[in-house]
């Protein structure tokens, strides 16, 4: 799920401050981790996710695309293009490919994503050996 920042409803616009609020933008429980990513064009994390259920990331993410464009493919087959300025929610069961050089910030359930990152590290070791 993605939405442009400018499309989020304004709840306050006064005294030089504008506040926007988007309710029901995913659900989370537990401690979150903050993550900052930079991808070169063409980076596809799919090979690193092979072996996880449905060969996809099993952690949900909330975030903001600072620059570039990425394509998210969900395990059901749907795809979504997310570009600079988009707020995103990616539920568990997805992969990501950078269509151009991209920078993004994500927030993820810490325990869930640590498990995925450990798996990705193991896959990277196999693929680069």
Go through the PLM ranges and name each one.
Residues 74-93:
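Short acidic-glycine-tyrosine-enriched beta hairpin
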